[in-house]
Every structure is written in structure tokens, then in C-alpha cells.
């Protein structure tokens, strides 16, 4: 516990908010290149093979893991993708999403509902 005098000399510092998607550098989206596309398993109560990609962000080259949403994808090594923030709760270390229907990432096939989230045009 500091004394009043100590607080007068050096006031308390307010803690700055933690950035949840630091690799985006305060941008809404960033372009990235896929380094490795693979599947991984989720945390304890859930069971699946979740599709993820290790991507290298254009401009300054930091590598992050991004989730590939939707059923089926056409991504492979050297695919250019657009990533956004947003974690996947049951995959530790996955703090970014790949935007479907932008750049090399194709929209989800035969998608009828929630099309805007998966890059599908109205048919």
C-alpha cells in the first residue's frame, strides 16, 4: 500500500486494454499467404477435425494460425487470403478467421442461408 505522499509523487497507472488481434495492427483485415493448410482437433468436450491454415501476413511477415470457416475449401500452400480477427473458442491459439469469397478463397458451395458470412452470391 503506497502512502498518500508516494501517490502524489507518482500517481497510479491505468492499465491499457489488451489487443485481441495484434497481428492485424489495428486494421479490420489483412492480406496473407498460406504457409500450411491442415486439420487440428478441438479442446476437451468437443470432437472434430477443424480446418486451419498457418498464414504469413503480407507487409511484415508475422505468422499466425487462421480458421477456415464453412464446409469444404480450395485453399492450399501459397494461396493468398484475407484474414480478420475473431477467435475459435475450442481451438487454442487460433485468433483469426479467413474471409471466404475474397482473393483466392472460394465461397462455400450450395450455401443458401447466412450467405454473406461465407462469400456466396445470390443464385
From Swiss-Prot:
Query: Which Gene3D superfamilies did the record assign?
Result: Nucleic acid-binding proteins
> Which keywords does this chain's UniProt record carry?
Methylation, Ribonucleoprotein, Ribosomal protein, RNA-binding, rRNA-binding, tRNA-binding
* Pfam families, per database record: Ribosom_S12_S23
Q: Name one GO cellular component term.
A: small ribosomal subunit
GO molecular function terms noted in the UniProt entry: rRNA binding; structural constituent of ribosome; tRNA binding
Region Disordered: start-end pairs: 1-25
**Cysteine pairings via disulfide bonds:** none
Any idea which residues bear 3-methylthioaspartic acid here? Answer: 90
Q: Which InterPro entries match?
A: NA-bd_OB-fold, Ribosomal_uS12, Ribosomal_uS12_bac
For biological process, the GO terms are: translation
Purpose:
With S4 and S5 plays an important role in translational accuracy. Interacts with and stabilizes bases of the 16S rRNA that are involved in tRNA selection in the A site and with the mRNA backbone. Located at the interface of the 30S and 50S subunits, it traverses the body of the 30S subunit contacting proteins on the other side and probably holding the rRNA structure together. The combined cluster of proteins S8, S12 and S17 appears to hold together the shoulder and platform of the 30S subunit.
Question: What assembly does the database describe for this protein?
Answer: Part of the 30S ribosomal subunit. Contacts proteins S8 and S17. May interact with IF1 in the 30S initiation complex.
The family note in this entry says:
Belongs to the universal ribosomal protein uS12 family.
Instruction: Provide the protein name.
Output: Small ribosomal subunit protein uS12
Amino acid at each position: 500500500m503506497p502512502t498518500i505522499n508516494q501517490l502524489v509523487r507518482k500517481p497510479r497507472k491505468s492499465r491499457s486494454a489488451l489487443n485481441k488481434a495484434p497481428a492485424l495492427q489495428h486494421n479490420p483485415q489483412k492480406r496473407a499467404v498460406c504457409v500450411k493448410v491442415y486439420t487440428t482437433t478441438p479442446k476437451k468436450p468437443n470432437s472434430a477435425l477443424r480446418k486451419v491454415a498457418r498464414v504469413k501476413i503480407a507487409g511484415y511477415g508475422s505468422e499466425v494460425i487462421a480458421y477456415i470457416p464453412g464446409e469444404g475449401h480450395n485453399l492450399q500452400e501459397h494461396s493468398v487470403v484475407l484474414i480478420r480477427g475473431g477467435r475459435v473458442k475450442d481451438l487454442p491459439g487460433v485468433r483469426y478467421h479467413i474471409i471466404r469469397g475474397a482473393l483466392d478463397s472460394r465461397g462455400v458451395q450450395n450455401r443458401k442461408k447466412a450467405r454473406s458470412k461465407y462469400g456466396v452470391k445470390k443464385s
